[in-house]
Structure formats: C-alpha cells, structure tokens
C-alpha cells in the first residue's frame, strides 16, 4: 500500500518530515521489544507488515517469540484478489487478519522479504519440535477475533461497526467506530500497559511500539516501519502525535489491550 502511487509520494514526504528532521533528544516513555525491522521493498504490502509486526511484539511480551512472513500474506492475496487491477496488493490491515484466518501463516525464515517466486510456499510449519499446517500455526499465533479493528468517523454512529469508505477496504470490512478522545485513551493505555497497536492511514501502515517526548515536551509515537534499517533511527519513525491522529483511519489492538482500565 505504498510504492508506485501518488499516495506513496505524499506519505513518503510526510515520513521524511517526521524522521529526517535535525537530531533531537527523544526521551522514551515506553518502547516495546520487537522483531528486526523488515523491508517491504517495491511491494504494496505495508498493511501486512504492520499487522504482523503487531502480532510479533504482542507475542514477545507474552514470553513467546514468532517471526512471521508478510510474503506469505502477499501470496495468499493472489487467491483472494482485489478488484483494484492497477494496485492489486493494496488492502487494509484487517485483510491480513482475514487472510491468516483463511489461509494460515508460515515463519519468516522460510519466506523472507527477498523470497523469489521460485521459492515454493511451504505446506508445513516446524516450530519448537512441533509440526503444524499453516492454518494450525496461524491459529496458534493469532486466534480468530483476537484483535479489535477500530476507527473514528464523527459522521457515523459511535459504538457501532461501520464500513470505512476508502478504496483499500475492498473487502468491505466493518470497524468499531468510537470517539477520537476514546480512541486516543485506549491507544495510550494499551502502550503504557505494554501492548502494541497497529496504525493505518490512507497511504501507509506501521506498528506503534512506543511513545516518546522531546525537550519541548512534544509527544511522539514510535512506529516500527517496513522500509528496512537503512533509515533514520534504524527503521523506526518518531511521528508527532498530532500528525499521527490527523492521518489515522484505523487502529488494531487485542481485545485484552482494549479492555484495560
């Protein structure tokens, strides 16, 4: 959901503005552990990278460790094609959850970022001495309905599920619509209680892994990006809070994180 589009250029300029500013002294209010930053390359699969990064960090914080393959999601998307023929890889983060529930998941080590088309899609997953089908493995790392999909649309009824009217929502997924202040409170509470949150805008998606502030007390959200490590901050983005909330169209967190008081 990034390369080869005007939207990508807008998002790229936005993120350059966020992350290429003169160096600042950031104070981390919270920074969650994470798997290594991946690189989506020329694909438009940022929605898959962001959602899987969220699941990975959630598992690390449970004392588990998984490293999942966005390339597998991209291959399964070919069986579940988008009506967008010009940009067939674009979708929402909810699509990653839907594809996992339907087609399963494999580990990053067997289908990494640089996997060529000649590298076959594995039929089995071997993990800690156990053998799983991709579907069994997916359900072990992300149970169906484990995550809540949230949005804020003032023109629609709150606390009802609504269809977010963006082209990437070609699956017609319905998200829980809540007030912006409530969405902010749930997000900050989740992070402070050590739960990652998946963030999505109209042009990009990333995993929120922390919060920070600078010497002027300006607040930032620390985002795990999917453009490789040859970037400022090793592939992390320090996005000012006002920009993050201005651009958000959807957030995803576990039901456990959402229910925190």
What spans do the regions from the language model cover?
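Structural recognition of the beta-strand scaffold that forms the well-ordered cores
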Residues: 45-48, 71-75, 96-99, 107-109, ...
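Active-site signature of cysteine proteases
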Residues: 21, 35, 125-261
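Bacterial Sec signal peptide processing site at the extreme N-terminus
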Residues: 19-27
